Amino acid sequence: MKKQLTQLTMALAGLSVAPMVFAQTAPGTGTVTFNGQLTADTCVINAGDINKTVTLDTVSAQSLPVAGATGDATNFTISVSQCPATLSSVAAHFETTNMDPATRNIINQATVSPATNVEVQLVDKDGKTPILLGSTGSFYPINAATQSATMSYYGQYYATGKTGAGNVTAVTSYTLAYQ
């Protein structure tokens, strides 16, 4: 009986492996190879830039009358220091925290008298190119002598329709990315 059970177990094990051994790549299929690198050290975000507050200009709701309209971009910087010599450049990668999936902008989270049909859009260093949440802004060189860098980005109002007056509060997260 024990011998039969062992033979049955081996036969079943062979059946489960058989499809894998003889499987062939089907037409229209391929592979994806991921390569990366983990760094032992990172730059330190300067104290005043860890939790940054950017005050956008006060504008009339009438200045954002249709979806896609934007307000003037307001500059903000993120500075880092104590960067390891092995790193040559740094950028902010803006997470999908509080993201509108349709626009990939930051939704308005104001709880008291919120403005309607308005979000905050991140903009790259040129003041024109949108940075969609889940993306990385431009990389900035790390100064080898000071082991520091300052990244410059913008935020601006972005209408999702005819806007209504009120408060705007938009919060997202970022992490540092390196090259």
Model feature map: region roles:
Residues 2-8, 19-179:
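Mature extracellular/passenger domains of Gram-negative fimbrial/pilin and adhesin proteins
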Residues 10-14:
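Hydrophobic helical h-region of N-terminal Sec-dependent signal peptides
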